From Swiss-Prot:
Source organism per UniProt: Puccinia graminis f. sp. tritici (strain CRL 75-36-700-3 / race SCCL) (Black stem rust fungus)
Function: Catalyzes 2 different reactions between oxygen and the acireductone 1,2-dihydroxy-3-keto-5-methylthiopentene (DHK-MTPene) depending upon the metal bound in the active site. Fe-containing acireductone dioxygenase (Fe-ARD) produces formate and 2-keto-4-methylthiobutyrate (KMTB), the alpha-ketoacid precursor of methionine in the methionine recycle pathway. Ni-containing acireductone dioxygenase (Ni-ARD) produces methylthiopropionate, carbon monoxide and formate, and does not lie on the methionine recycle pathway.
Amino-acid positions noted as binding Ni(2+) in the UniProt annotation, renumbered to this chain: 82, 84, 88, 128
GO molecular function, one term: iron ion binding
Stated name of the protein: Acireductone dioxygenase
Family affiliation: Belongs to the acireductone dioxygenase (ARD) family.
Length: 181
């Protein structure tokens, strides 16, 4: 995993790195409520699933071959800024991609490069987006506390006032009093 401030000036495709010179540490991600583990085996995933009460899982393959004609439509959907009312938990089994999350100012994107073995947990209420990288392939295990579902609430006035969003802002505000990045 590698995290850094997303270079907004770049005119490149969202699937490019958009590398800036500002790196973001694992500790800084934790202040945003984002959790990360480097996982070598399914046994480690199972252990975290038990600790965090993840009862269900499935797998998604995001590639032109796996998704066919709907691939670009799905990429566009995933890259639209949105939040969820549940944690978003992904363990990368193969391939790579980028999760972008809003920083504590809600003005900049923090880009998180994920690759095989990376397990990422995004908290409910955080605005984020996802895309594969230039290799156009990722296979990820999705973990869920309840029944598998993926309900995205795109950024809007309505989603800004969502109770999960408000709870997230309160949580991050408390973490930021301990030192912003």
């Amino acid at each position: 995993m590698r995290a850094y401030i997303y270079d907004e000036e770049s005119q490149l495709s969202p699937q490019d790195e958009h590398e800036s010179s500002q790196s973001v540490s694992k500790q800084e991600l934790e202040k945003l409520g984002v959790l990360y583990w480097s996982i070598d085996s399914i046994d480690q995933v199972n252990s975290i699933a038990i600790q965090r009460d993840y009862k269900n899982r499935d797998q998604i393959i995001c590639s032109p071959q796996a998704m066919g004609d709907i691939y670009q439509q799905k990429l566009d959907t995933f890259f639209e800024e949105h939040l969820h009312e549940d944690e978003e938990i992904r363990w990368v089994v193969e391939g790579s991609g980028y999760f972008d999350v809003r920083d504590q100012t809600d003005q900049r994107w923090v880009r998180i490069k994920v690759e095989k073995g990376d397990l990422l947990v995004l908290p409910p209420g955080i605005f984020h987006r996802f895309t594969v990288d230039k290799d156009n392939y990722i296979k990820a295990m999705r973990l869920f506390k309840d029944e598998p579902k993926w309900v995205a609430l795109n950024r809007s006035t309505e989603s800004e006032s969502n109770p999960y969003r408000k709870a997230y802002i309160e949580q991050v505000g408390k973490a930021m009093t301990m030192g912003a990045f």
